[in-house]
Amino acid sequence: MKESLAISSSKVLLVPYEKRHVNTYHEWMKSKEIQKVTASEPLTLKEEYLMQESWRHDHDKLTFIICRPTSTPITKVMAGTHDANRLLLGDINLFLFAAQDYNNCCIGELELMVAPLHARRQGYGRAALLCFLYYIQTHLDELMTEYCGSKNSKSKTMHLLYLRVKIHSENTNSIKLFESIGFRKVSDTADFFGELEFKLENCTEPETTTELLEKFGIEAYTKLPCIEEVSTGGFNDEQNNHSTAISD
């Protein structure tokens, strides 16, 4: 599942998190407001590059950078063009971990961030979330197989028990967004970081997600190859720890 694959729709474009995105991501995470609502500590640029490597290649993680949608239909995503810095909006992630007290089961934690203030409450977060959720549901067997190959899994088969998200109690927009697609609050009591947990049961079938995509006018869901135009380099060329959601 770590191939260079993008997800295109009428409302948003999702591309794999690559080294060329790290500088922009690093600038986003300097925001005190983002640090608060994502329960994050700022990382150095070098640490961000190491984190990108982890999110891109670890078997228990899946991440995409959220971009503005293309203005015309495309058949492939050109790296550095369709995901140029000016088009980047945030990120969306899935982290899998073993479920306690359940054999051969795991839980998926979602993380969503729309970083620029001007891009929030424009529908980008909802579009990214629904496209990402549909991707997970329609590639679940591959994701579970890959997770079984991670160092955190001791099983040869795996079942996704449910999806969860942690949202700062003051982040009412994100709470409304996740509740609007079926997530339900686990407890009214926030944790040490001021976060509330929300859970999506029955998360493995795409039918409900398909209905929500239609309801919110998110059309033309398509998987596209990402084509590298040039070598992007790494930390020496250019010189997250976040756990929750900022959205529309």
Segments predicted by a language model, with ranges:
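Generic structural signal for individual residues within well-ordered alpha-helical segments
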Residues: 23-26, 35, 49
